[in-house]
Amino acid sequence: MNSISLAIQDLLDDTEYGLELVLLAGGAGVGHRIHSSRIQKPGLALTGYTEHLHPDRVQVLGNTEISYLQQISEQQALIHIQKLCSYPISCFIVTKGLDPPGFLKAEAERAGIPLLVTPHQSSTFISLITKFLEERLLPTTHIHGVLVDVLGVGVLILGKSGIGKSECALDLVIRGHRLVADDVVYVKKKMPAALVGQAAEAIQHHMEIRGLGVINIKNLFGVSSIREKKIIDMVIELVDWDPVQEYDRLGLDDEVYAILDVELPHIKIPVRPGRNLTSIIEVAARNHLLKGMGYHSAREFHEKLLARMEVRPLGNEVE
């Protein structure tokens, strides 16, 4: 179960997604927590069959469910509702502005289960609340780094403080690429395995350059130089040059960097005077695009080299 949760009160307080929910009964339960973004229509649970009931999910009652409760005898309906309310239901939401039966209101109030109503049709509301819950319940983290859109590739630049991450990003922006976030990158995991990065609202569109201070990229270079959010496709880590360290010179070994259990291509770039890091990052992004099309430059070169070694002439050998 996702450790992130929302209170029912958060649904009532929504103004961004247009849920338009009103509390009818069960106000004592507005602190109930929602852990799942999945929605359930109780259906058979209203007939007494609760084998596949998921009480942790939001229970949506549409025209079909309300009509069924109104058509069967009140005594029979009350038995089924009491059984349903014996479970730790997060909340009931009635769609289409329908007026639920009085016994449902009374039982929800007695059990402390919030009973809400929305004017939306069931299909519309389920779409809205699913989007709301998915956004709010996504696993998140924050990373010290810079996120740039390079040729459509989301490049997360990492490295120790002062190594030149922001300067690289600024040079990339000057070359026509787009800044997403500088210094702190907020990352959300979207199912099944996509990571979306964005800037903290307070520092969005801004960048800190040592010796220059904080600059506003949007104002300096225009709206085409920034993005609100971007899927992270690869990680480039800037590291200090170590003369005794053996660095990958062929690119045959594909390393990965894990964020929220999602593995991303990971490249380490040694930093030393004279190296054009911006060009290297651009080429890394282009190479990533090629790999996505099934072309691996290093492997093709390696295979050609092996083939030439196998067919080369043996020379003048003495028998």
Swiss-Prot record:
Gene3D superfamilies registered for this protein in UniProt: HprK N-terminal domain-like, P-loop containing nucleotide triphosphate hydrolases
Any one GO BP annotation for this protein: regulation of carbohydrate metabolic process
Any Pfam family the entry gives: Hpr_kinase_C
Region annotated Important for the catalytic mechanism of both phosphorylation and dephosphorylation, chain positions: 207-216
CC annotations in GO: cytosol
Keywords: ATP-binding, Kinase, Magnesium, Metal-binding, Multifunctional enzyme, Nucleotide-binding, Serine/threonine-protein kinase, Transferase
EC number(s) on file: 2.7.11.-, 2.7.4.-
A GO MF label: magnesium ion binding
Binding, ATP: G159, K160, S161, G162, I163, G164, K165, S166
Region ranges (Important for the catalytic mechanism of dephosphorylation): 270-275
Note: Both phosphorylation and phosphorolysis are carried out by the same active site and suggest a common mechanism for both reactions.
Domain notes: The Walker A ATP-binding motif also binds Pi and PPi.
Family that this chain belongs to: Belongs to the HPrK/P family.
Name of this chain's protein: HPr kinase/phosphorylase
Gene designation per UniProt: hprK
